[in-house]
Amino acid sequence: MTGLSGRSAIAGIGATDFSKKSGRSELRLAAEAVLDALDDAGLSPSDVDGLVTFTMDSNLETAVARATGIGELKFFSQIGYGGGAAAATVQQAALAVAAGGAEVVVAYRAFNERSEFRFGQVMTGLSSTADSRGVEYSWSYPHGLSTPAASVAMIARRYMHEYGATSADFGAVSVADRKHAATNPKAFFYGKPITIEDHQNSRMIADPVRLLDCCQESDGGVAIVVTTPERAKDLKNRPVIIEAAAQGSGEDQFTMYSYYRDELGLPEMGLVGRQLWDQSGLTPNDIQTAILYDHFTPYTLLQLEELGFCGKGEAKDFIANGAIELGGKLPINTHGGQLGEAYIHGMNGIAEGVRQLRGTSVNQVPNVEHVLVTAGTGVPTSGLILG
């Protein structure tokens, strides 16, 4: 183990309910999640001296501190690139703790992404902004690639052409996630599993991406408490050690996908994976369950390949016959993922990784020692190994 490995721990997790209309402000959602996480850890707001969130979060660290009764902050930070920031919020909290910059740091994300601003809509104005983002979007928007689903669809179609994958292969991810969500009382799709026939009959969003290949749009908030292993062991719950944490941006990186690369893949996730294995001293064979960012099912297959669980083009075979379901060789997204539980930019997946290691998941995998968690795909991204 090297670098950050073993020098910080997750001591608490918290969340609001997940819904399509929260009826509360985004600041209230953030405050509820933070206070819930502190209660889970057995800490009070006065113990917190650091806050981390996303650049896309509308709730400034100072506002959350005021709303929750947190006092002075020694560390505060925001990470960019949307869902790619999820694991990086925990990484930055861990770095602050390991370096002595803060003792208790809370990472949070909260939004009304369904009842207010919806990320999946066409936003043509992005391609005309007078900044580098406008230049990037101007490459893709004129060709109709103006939503996340459309961008993923182009790569999914090429992946099918290159490796013989089918829509049903993508559907296997959705079926697994919904199966897990069906037994999770906190999931939006609790009690609502689907079949592969349901997936194949769902309407097309951007060929070949179907409705049931797409994550939900959700209102809610999640928070994660990070502190030192020494302090964590004296708190309420079993400390979950951060065995590795990494960020990655590939060569010629764009948003959602980098169309001008020579090879089909997600090299930014491959870079994250290599760092995680190096820091932790582990291999894919050491992982009992994984939480893979599943905003769209095709990218779940590409992640399995980039992280070394299987070779290029082999993910369709790797996931066959229930391999990623509870009881399979690598259960993924045992909370239901963003397809089944809620889309909270990946933060709810980190919380599920903690539950698996505590032994408190509603879909508990036996004898869990190490959990891999990834953040948003197609963008500069991040990942964790928890143990």
Functional labels for PLM-detected ranges:
Residues 262-297, 306-309, 338-342:
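Extended C-terminal subregions enriched in glycine
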Residues 45-54, 75-77, 105-110, 168-175, ...:
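Beta-strand segments within the central parallel beta-sheet cores of soluble alpha/beta enzyme folds
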Residues 58-67, 252-258, 294-317, 380-386:
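Short glycine/threonine-rich loop-to-helix capping motif typified by GTGT followed
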Residues 1-24, 172, 204-267, 271, ...:
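Condensing-enzyme catalytic core mediating Claisen C-C bond formation in acyl metabolism
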Residues 1-84, 92, 96, 155, ...:
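Conserved active-site "lid/cap" helical segment
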Residues 2-4, 54-151, 190-216, 248-250, ...:
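Conserved catalytic cysteine-centered active-site region
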Residues 22-23, 116-122, 182-186, 253-256, ...:
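Short acidic, glycine/serine/threonine-rich loops at helix termini
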Residues 81-111, 149-183, 224-230, 341-361:
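Active-site-proximal alpha-helical scaffold in enzymes
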